[in-house]
Amino acid sequence: MATTHLTAALALLCALLQVDIEASSWWSLAMNPVQIPEAYIVGAQPLCSQLPGLSPGQKKLCQLYQDHMPYIGEGAKTGIKECQYQFRHRRWNCSTVDNASVFGRVMQIGSRETAFTYSISAAGVVNAVSRACREGELSTCGCSRAARPKDLQRDWLWGGCGDNLEYGYRFAKEFVDAREREKIHTKGSYESSRTLMNIHNNEAGRRTVYNLADAACKCHGVSGSCSLKTCWLQLADFRKVGDFLKEKYDSAASMRLNARGKLVQVNSRFNPPTTNDLVYVDTSPDYCVRNESTGSLGTQGRLCNKTSEGMDGCELMCCGRGYDQFKTVQTERCHCKFHWCCYVKCKKCTEIVDQFVCK
C-alpha cells in the first residue's frame, strides 16, 4: 500500500516538474539581465547553458549570437512593461510571478491576453535588436540599409544611420519562433492549435514594429535654415506599438483547427484575420478571483476608481464584491516660480486623498 502511494506521489511530482519545464520561457531573460563575460574563465559554465527558459533551438542561437542576448532580455522587459501599462486598468493587469514562466499558468490558456503578451514581447525583441544594430552594439549588423521611401521629397538626402529593422525583424523571427517550430504535436491536437496561435501572434507583433517605423529627418543650413534635410529610418515610440496591439487585442479573432490542421475563424461571417491581427483559441478565464489552476491572481486588493464607469471603476474591477476606502497623504511640487536666471523654485504641498481597493 505504501509503495502504491509512493509511486503515485512520484508520478504527480514528475507531472508538476514537466508542467514547470514546459511553462518556462525566454521571457525570463527580462527578469535577470544577461551579463556577457569579458573573458573566458577555465572551468566556467557556458553562458547559454546558464540562461533559464531557452529551448534547444534558442540555446543554439544563443551560442552563435551571444552578444544579442542582453538585447533579447531588454526587448522582453520592454514588452512586459508595455503590457503592464496597457492593462493597468483591467482585471488582468499583466502581473508577473517569481519563476521562469514569468506570467504563471495563465499563459497556458490560449486567450486574448496570451495573444497580446506573445505579440508585445516579440515586438520588444525587434525593437531592441534593431536599435542595438544602429548603435554598433552587435557584431553582425550595423545601420539600416533600407531603400529610400518613394514619398520622400527629391531634394532630401536619404542616409544617416537608421534603426536596422530588416535585421531586427529577421533575428527576432528566428529566435522567438524557434521554441514553437521545434515542437512536434499530433495533427489536430490542442497543442498544435496553440503553436499556430503563438506563431501568428509573434508575427503580428514583429510586423507592427516594422510597419510603424518611419523616416526621421534633420535640418542642415546656415543659421538653422532648413535648406537641406538628411533622413533615415527610425523606430516608432514603443507606446505606439503598444497602443496598436491593444486595439488588435480588443478586436482579436476567435479561431479553431479545421480538418486539415489549419487555424480558421470560429465565426465565418467575419473577414478572416490578417497577419497584423491577433488570434486566440480559448475564452479568457475568470480574472475576478484567485485561481491557481488558471493562474488568475484575482482583483482583491487592487486599486479602483470610485467615479469611473469603465474597467478601472470599482464596480467592474471588484466584480461586484464591493470595496474598502482609506486615506493616503500625497506630496507634490506646487507654487512653482521661475527665478532669473535660471532656475525654478517650488514649494511642497501635501493633501489627503481618498483611495479605494477591492474587497
UniProtKB/Swiss-Prot annotation:
Keyword flag Signal: yes
Tissue specificity as recorded in UniProt: Neuroectodermal and non-neuroectodermal tissues.
Cellular compartment(s): Secreted, Extracellular space, Extracellular matrix; Secreted
Gene, per the UniProt record: WNT-5A
PTM annotation: Palmitoleoylation is required for efficient binding to frizzled receptors. Depalmitoleoylation leads to Wnt signaling pathway inhibition.
InterPro entries referenced in this protein's UniProt entry, alphabetically: Wnt, Wnt_C, Wnt_CS
O-palmitoleoyl serine: lipidated positions: S223
Source organism, top-level taxon: Eukaryota
Gene Ontology biological process terms from the UniProt entry: canonical Wnt signaling pathway; cell fate commitment; neuron differentiation
Taxonomic source organism: Ambystoma mexicanum
Molecular-function GO terms, alphabetical: cytokine activity; frizzled binding
Family: Belongs to the Wnt family.
Pfam families reported for this sequence: wnt
Glycosylation-annotated residues: N93, N99, N291, N305
SMART domains: WNT1
Disulfide topology: C83-C94, C133-C141, C143-C161, C217-C231, C219-C226, C288-C319, C304-C314, C318-C358, C334-C349, C336-C346, C341-C342
Primary location class: secreted
Assigned keywords, A-Z: Developmental protein, Disulfide bond, Extracellular matrix, Glycoprotein, Lipoprotein, Secreted, Signal, Wnt signaling pathway
Function: Ligand for members of the frizzled family of seven transmembrane receptors. Can activate or inhibit canonical Wnt signaling, depending on receptor context. Required during embryogenesis for extension of the primary anterior-posterior axis.
Record protein name field: Protein Wnt-5a
Any single Gene Ontology cellular-component annotation: extracellular space
Signal sequence bounds: 1-20
Gene3D superfamilies from the UniProt entry: 3.30.2460.20
